[in-house]
Amino acid sequence: NIIIDTKIANFAAMKLEYINNLKHTDSGNFFLLAGPCVVEGEEITFHIAETICEITDKLKIPYVFKASYRKANRSKADSFTGIGDEKALEILAKIKDRFNVPVVTDIHNIPEANLAASYGVDILQIPAFLCRQTDLLEAAAMTGKCVNIKKGQFLSPQAMKFAAEKVVKCGNNKVMLTERGTQFGYSDLVVDFRSVPEMQIFGFPVILDVTHSLQEPNQSSGVTGGRPHLISTIAKAGVASGVDGLFMETHPDPSSALSDGANMLRLDLMEDLLTKLIRIKQVL
């Protein structure tokens, strides 16, 4: 087994120095990965990025812009998957340059690791359903980019050690682990907040994916449901549990979003929620 160097990992978790252009790292706040589920077009994606950058600068929250350039895991064959890989990646590159903010996006197969990295993506995200795919983890690791591994809905937090080791063995200690809920029956997820300290034992930053944790998957309609009215509750509990970072998908009008609208945070609610979460963080 690969032995994770927790001294290196803990130092990185504390400073997050391996994420280029990450601001406000000395604020003592949690860091935030947030944005739309998928790049829908340049105008709306820029609007979301600009809005969150203004909020996080005001609140001094370290911020990474999040958007998938392509959605490979959709329920139905005719579900929206993207506007085109290169077009979407170009938009992410423009956002990084325009707002001087790091960006994170998902990859789904080996060639996509180098493709996304070539557009300057700072964090390569491994989707939960792919978190055990050794070749994919190794391909992401070999780019030298930070790798955010989402915990599969079917995995224990302890088992995520082995996913992290697959990246570390490639000489890349830039790892993050994300809790995104555990399957509860066929069509529901629950969050076991014990996962946060259990995964922090490995020494890497642990993120709570707030919005995906509220999904209601496997609906007979072929459209994933969600309970966005619980976003605030799950986010508050996550901060109270000591999570290092939060992941939230957001949109100006979730009802018109092209993917995952049922569990998104409405963009105009973002600042108020983050303000409340900072207050919780300050009393820990």
Question: Which residues does each PLM region occupy?
Answer:
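N-terminal amphipathic alpha-helix/helix-capping segment at the start of soluble metabolic enzymes
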Residues: 14-32, 284
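Glycine-enriched alpha-helix->loop->beta-strand junction motifs that scaffold or abut catalytic
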Residues: 115-125, 139-147, 168-174, 202-205, ...
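Hydrophobic faces of well-ordered beta-strands that scaffold small-molecule active sites
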Residues: 32-34, 63-67, 103-105, 124-126, ...
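Active-site glycine- and acidic-residue-rich loops that bind
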Residues: 37-50, 150-161, 180-198, 216-235
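Alpha-helix-loop-beta-strand connector modules within alpha/beta enzyme cores
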Residues: 52, 80-103, 140-146, 197-206, ...
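Conserved anion-binding
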Residues: 75, 129-198
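Glycine-rich, proline-tolerant flexible connector loops at the mouths of alpha/beta enzymes
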Residues: 36-45, 63-85, 250-261
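N-terminal active-site wall of soluble small-molecule enzyme domains
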Residues: 67-125, 132-136
